[in-house]
């Protein structure tokens, strides 16, 4: 009986991030697209500024990469989140499953692993589909900074 109950525990509650298979690791991504928005770094302070400018490979409507398997060929600056480098990504959104699980928290109620689809995530406006703009439409990147410093407000 106890063995049966163990099997009913979702993998993200029964395994550490390091213990997860590659498929389990990948499935943690909710597909919000927040990682695929360009970030700017202040050269003097190293502060990161978030923009609403989508990577050229991001399909804004679906919040999915157009060329996920070959994304590094198309976008050399694309960053691969791994178990090893996760602690260095302090800029991950507070809603990110990787961040939440690393902090000992559970998945949010709208997460696709719990709901079976991305509809609840989009409904909660977690995804970037309602704020993202195409890189090709941007004239001045500074106009698209979401977390402007006080001096730039």
From Swiss-Prot:
It comes from the Bacteria. InterPro entries: Puta_zinc/iron-chelating_dom, UCP006173. PANTHER family: UPF0260 PROTEIN YCGN (PTHR37421:SF1). Belongs to the UPF0260 family. HAMAP family: UPF0260. This is UPF0260 protein YcgN. It comes from Shigella boydii serotype 18 (strain CDC 3083-94 / BS512). The lineage of its organism: Bacteria, Pseudomonadati, Pseudomonadota, Gammaproteobacteria, Enterobacterales.
């Amino acid at each position: 009986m106890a063995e049966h109950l163990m099997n009913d525990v979702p993998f993200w509650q029964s395994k550490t991030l390091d213990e997860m298979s590659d498929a389990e690791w990948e499935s943690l991504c909710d597909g919000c697209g927040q990682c695929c928005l360009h970030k700017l770094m202040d050269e003097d302070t190293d502060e990161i500024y978030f923009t609403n400018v989508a990577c050229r490979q991001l399909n804004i409507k679906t919040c999915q990469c157009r060329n996920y398997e070959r994304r590094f060929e198309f976008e050399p600056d694309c960053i691969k989140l791994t178990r090893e480098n996760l602690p260095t990504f302090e800029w991950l959104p507070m809603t990110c499953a990787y961040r939440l699980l690393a902090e000992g928290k559970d998945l949010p109620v709208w997460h696709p692993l719990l709901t079976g689809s991305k509809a609840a995530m989009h409904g909660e406006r977690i995804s970037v589909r309602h704020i993202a703009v195409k890189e090709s439409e941007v004239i001045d990147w500074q106009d698209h900074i979401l977390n402007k410093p006080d001096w730039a407000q």
